[in-house]
Amino acid sequence: MAEKAKVVKVGPGGARGPRPKVENPGKIFMRIMRYVGETYTVAMVAVVVCIVVSVLATVQGTLFMQKLIDNYILPLLAEQSSDFSGLAAAIGRTAAFYVCGIIANFSQARIMAHVTQGTLKRLRDDLFTHMQTLPIQYFDRNAHGDIMSIYTNDTDTLRQMISQSIPQLFNSSIMVVSVLVSMIALSPLLTLVTLIMVGVMLLATKYLTGNSGKYFVAQQRDLGAVNGFIEEMMNGQKVVKVFCHEDEAIQQFNELNDALFESADKANRYANLGGPVNTQLGNLSYVLAAMIGGALALGGVGGLTLGKLASFLTFNRSLNMPISQISMQFNSVIMALAGGQRVFALMDEKPEIDEGQVKLVNAKRLADDSITETDERTNLWAWKRVNADGTADYRELKGDIVFEDVDFGYYPEKIVLHDVNLYGRPGQKIAFVGSTGAGKTTITNLINRFYDIQKGAIHYDGIDITHIRKSDLRASLGIVLQDTHLFTGTVLENIRYGRLTATDEECRAAAKLANADEFIRRLPEGNNTMLTGDGTNLSQGQRQLLAIARAAVADPPVLILDEATSSIDTRTERLVQQGMDGLMYGRTTFVIAHRLSTVRNSDCIMVLEQGRIIERGTHDELIAQKGKYYTLYTGNFAENS
């Protein structure tokens, strides 16, 4: 019998490792409460007042039972009196207390609903704002579905904690204190019996919540893994079907789902035991108090009357209920702390370091041929450096890119680029060729500082790019990435993403330059056609054309074209190339392409192999050398010529 092939796991559900736990739960709890308190201090004070009023109303109602029996019912029965005026007045006062309690409960619920949603809004705002500052490496090493789970599942656990658990815990704590004081006043001896049972309930709660807590952390982790896998499979569904890997995908999902079931089952098994266990212990406490209290009342011991016993037993039940609620709410708090740990882990990720001081500004040329800053768009840009004395130096942006002895690795211990030296002068077209994994795309990612180098230097118009603010550096570059991404919005809005201040006419001109205008006119609503789901209603070639138009509308001095025409048919490529030639005129352009047409007319071709530049020169020079480029050209490139 043939051995079953091993399933290679490609999703985010790798090794699960040891069971995680909440680190510094007290610190996480205080961070959550700071989010609530900093914005809603007055509202939370109002909630506390409402809870106190509600508890006092409940306690007053229970104490009324003792007066009702001892002061009204028993005397009325003994005297055979028909005067119920005193009883009616007492009932009216108690009813007023209950009405106040109802109003307080209603007000508390309304206020907490507003506080909860406002706090979560602020939390999501801070999460998203911080996420925009994170380096690309963070998104490289974390599954996107797992990040989405932080925004949805983990923040939802905080919603339950803020809206329900925190008010209920405070309510129950106030209730326990108030009830205990009242019980001691009624019968210290019975209170001692009750406290012994309360101790047993607390021990049970500690055991159950301790076990459920560690599994809740695992549950949130496994839930993130499941979401990450689903998101990955949705994006790669065509690849799954092409290679007929549906069964393997189902098997991987089942493994992740089984892990989630295991952690969630154990977490909720312990959590759900808390309520029934404490309820039965509470019933036992009630029975013991009733038996002992009945004997004391019948014997007239300790001044315990029938009315006091009735009130005490009601308090006993009232005490058991908040303790059970505390047990149940602790589970929600522990789950929220597990979610909060993941939320704050994202918020504590170190933002992208940007120590640049040089800014990109609109400039104009003066009569003496010097340049200065202007608020108007002049199609002339300059790098602005502010000196210590407050004066500013301006250097015209030309698009001069120089690499000097650059080493780079995605991980410090694994260098993928070695001693890279290159330069691109204004108006030059530099092409990178080489086999897959040679480092072509990596070089372009270093120009826009998606990643920082380990050794060497990169200069832009003579300025070390680490001295230039990243936002200004990237604003000076027009980039068509290998992975085209379109946003939900109209065609025109997607083109305008290259420069948000661009007019409709400028966007249409950019589309025409990229030769995208022809297919846009054929769309149902032309430029106003809505694109959704990363432009799935367009072909891959059409999506690439829009990406090129988006780069064109930015009108940058430097272009980076990473596989820019790899998804366009030969006929469309010729049209695009005509537009791109006009766009590239006078600009430094770096091209990574597999098609001969985008490489052959380059001013300089760099051949990379295993992270090193092994050949450089024009097409004719490299062909004459009959080296690596000659092999590529006569092989792969010749097939596409």
Regions found by a protein language model. Give the residues of each.
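Membrane-integrated ABC transporters
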Residues: 1-58, 73-92, 108-112, 116, ...
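Juxtamembrane helix-loop junctions of ABC transporter transmembrane domains
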Residues: 17-25, 57-73, 97-144, 148-152, ...
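Hydrophobic alpha-helical transmembrane segments of ABC transporter permease domains
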Residues: 30, 104, 108, 116, ...
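Helix-loop junctions and hydrophobic alpha-helical segments within the transmembrane domains
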Residues: 127, 131, 240, 343, ...
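An intracellular "coupling" helix at the cytosolic face of ABC transporter transmembrane type-1 domains
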Residues: 136-137, 153-162, 166, 170, ...
